[in-house]
Amino acid sequence: MIIKNLQEFYRLLIPNAPLIAIDYGSKKLGIALSNQELSIAMPLNTITEINTKIVITVLLNIIEKYKVCGVIIGLPIDMSGAVTEQTNIVMKFAEELAKSINLPIYLQDERLTTKAANNLLKSFGVKRKDRNNNDDAVAASMILETVLDSIKNI
C-alpha cells in the first residue's frame, strides 16, 4: 500500500526491521538498505534490468532475504515541484509493486539525488564508469537517509 504521510508510514513499520529505498531510473534501479535500528542507510545494489516483472521479482527476493518492513521509492519531480513523465512512470511502478507486497510504500522527493551521488563519488576519485555503475545505489541511500533523518523527528 502506498502511504502518503510519513508519520503513518512510520506507524506501520515493524520494529527492528530494515527498510529499502529505490532510486528508479529509466535505465537502471539503485537499491539501498537501512540497518534494523533505522539509523544508517547503505547502498546495496544496482539493477540494470528495467522490465517491471523482473525488477519486482528481484525486489521480492531482497525483501525476503533482509526481512524488510517497508519500502521508500524516490519520486522524481522537477525543480518547480511539477509532475514529469518520469514521475508518472515511477508512480505506475510503485502501484505495481504495491500489488505484489504487503508492506507500506512511501514516496520521497528525490530531486537531484543522482547528481549529488555522482558528485560525491567523483569527489572520492571514483572513475566515471564506476560512478555510473554505482550512482543510483548511492542515490537510493541518500533518499533513504532523508527518510531516516525525518523519522528521527517523529
Swiss-Prot record:
Alphabetized Pfam families for the sequence: RuvX
One GO BP annotation of this record: rRNA 5'-end processing
Gene3D superfamilies: YqgF/RNase H-like domain
Localization in the cell: Cytoplasm
CDD domains found in the cross-reference section: YqgF (cd16964)
Enzyme category, top tier: hydrolase
Principal place of residence: cytoplasm
Name this protein carries in UniProt: Putative pre-16S rRNA nuclease
Native source organism of the sequence: Rickettsia rickettsii (strain Sheila Smith)
